[in-house]
Amino acid sequence: MKGKFIVLEGLEGAGKTTALHTVVEQLRSLGITDLVFTREPGGTPLAEKLRQLIKHETEEPVTDKAELLMLYAARIQLVENVIKPALAAGKWVIGDRHDLSSQAYQGGGRGLDRHFMQTLKDSVLGGFEPDFTLYLDIEPAEGLARARGRGELDRIEQAGLDFFNRTRTRYLELVRDNPKAVVINARQNIERVTADIQSAVKKFVESQHG
């Protein structure tokens, strides 16, 4: 079987880290063990430096478009230098965020023009996209409360509840129209969330054998 690219998406506090472990365990139980893990922004030396600029306060205000362009610079470095080579080698790539995050956070939360967003995506990524996306859906207030419980919030996490409400609305619009995406209700108890993720991953893997 060819390598596949699976991405976990969601707001802060949605439980992506726990979900990633569930995805990995389920894939391994199905005999898929040659895995590569990525995170966005980040995943290459240059992309990790950009991550620091994006997520932490700088000496000058970061404009919304500058933020977006840094995200795409980090993303294309990761796609070309890590993800595509891994897929070509038959490995499965598990990503903590990908382009849907930019469409939701910068397109929805920041309110950047959607035509501009789509043009940039097409120019940078071409037709490259995940084979399967799991979107962990949670109420923004609950997610932010969980994130605060982990410690200090980064620059983007400090954006405020209205920002995250807009981000979630855009996420839901995007996954509703994406046949390669599944919504997981992350407000359920951990056992139910785990079972839903296991079921979705199993169904996806089985579909690849068809």
UniProtKB/Swiss-Prot annotation:
Q: Does the keyword Kinase apply?
A: yes
PROSITE patterns for the chain: THYMIDYLATE_KINASE (PS01331)
Q: Does the keyword Nucleotide-binding apply?
A: yes
- Taxonomically, what lineage is the organism? Bacteria, Pseudomonadati, Pseudomonadota, Gammaproteobacteria, Pasteurellales
Binding-site positions, ATP? G10, L11, E12, G13, A14, G15, K16, T17
- Family membership noted in the UniProt record: Belongs to the thymidylate kinase family.
Record-level Gene Ontology MF annotations: ATP binding; dTMP kinase activity
Q: Which Gene3D superfamilies match?
A: P-loop containing nucleotide triphosphate hydrolases
Name the chemical reaction catalysed here: dTMP + ATP = dTDP + ADP
Task: Please list the GO biological process terms of this entry.
Answer: dTDP biosynthetic process; dTTP biosynthetic process; dUDP biosynthetic process
Q: What is its EC number?
A: 2.7.4.9
One term under GO cellular component: cytosol
What's the short name of a Pfam family annotated to this entry?
Thymidylate_kin
Membrane-crossing segments per the record: none
Its top-level enzyme class, in one word, is transferase
> What is this protein identified as?
Thymidylate kinase
Q: What UniProt keywords apply to this chain's record, in alphabetical order? A: ATP-binding, Kinase, Nucleotide biosynthesis, Nucleotide-binding, Transferase
**What's this protein's function?**
Phosphorylation of dTMP to form dTDP in both de novo and salvage pathways of dTTP synthesis.
